[in-house]
């Protein structure tokens, strides 16, 4: 059996993922939990990490590379930001060591856009960009990373020129649970209404100024003409994703389509949205991208 060379950790706000990686970059063991930054701040970051390392029988001196919210100001050790324009190679060079630990633990920095008119930050997504594009990426790329807070980044020659964050996932959660539209989606089952989703994407993309009105129409249409809770859910999702795409696709584009870094249900929804709008999109699995980015960092730090 192959021997682990390092552990790679993606530490989000509400989630934790760890992989034991061998010399060839293969995954030997995997751990997942809901012990994200919020939980780890209470339990102790070192204790949470050690519990997962113990569960996979990791050696006491096994090095660990971490990306995500463990490096936030409220996290374990603040890893700071690289300012745009930020070359992806800088991520490899500016990992921050965690002091006072028996093993070598490094946390990767985030990226900041210090523009008074469009301030923005990312932490964790930079590692996905690194894994998706590589440090030697040539040409122009527009990258969409869906999530609770979706990121759109414009990358030129391996340098993140600009990026923007959209609270699409969080808005979907709030709108569908905490507003009048919660009544429209009550008891929604798993059935999909692809046509409702596609129609909502197009309407929002073509008339983003009507965002608030389009959302209310989900409820009024159901009251006046009927429709299932599942269909209403798909309309809300399509509306919010359509609004995001209207902004993300605005302005100059690379000419080579969109690089979509996503997994699971989000990958399916965003790919359908791009196809509906006749926008070419190349899909890269988000989990593979973050793992590849962490591996690139480990190789640069420890010359694995």
Feature annotation, model-predicted:
Residues 40, 111-205:
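Glycine-rich phosphate-binding loop plus the immediately following alpha-helix
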Residues 61-72, 147, 241, 254-264:
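Short glycine-rich phosphate-binding loop at a beta-alpha junction
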Residues 22-26, 101, 154-159:
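Short acidic-glycine loop/turn motifs at beta-strand connectors
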Residues 9-15, 69, 145-149, 168, ...:
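A short acidic Gly-Thr/Ser loop motif
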Residues 6-44, 284:
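Short glycine-rich, Thr/Ser-proximal phosphate-binding strand/loop in the N-terminal lobe
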Residues 16, 23, 180-304:
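ATP-binding/phosphotransfer module of carbohydrate and carboxylate kinases, centering on a glycine-rich
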Residues 27-62, 71-78, 183-184:
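N-terminal phosphate-binding loop and adjacent alpha-helix
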Residues 56-119, 157:
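Short beta-strand-loop/turn "lid" adjacent to the catalytic site in phosphate-handling enzymes
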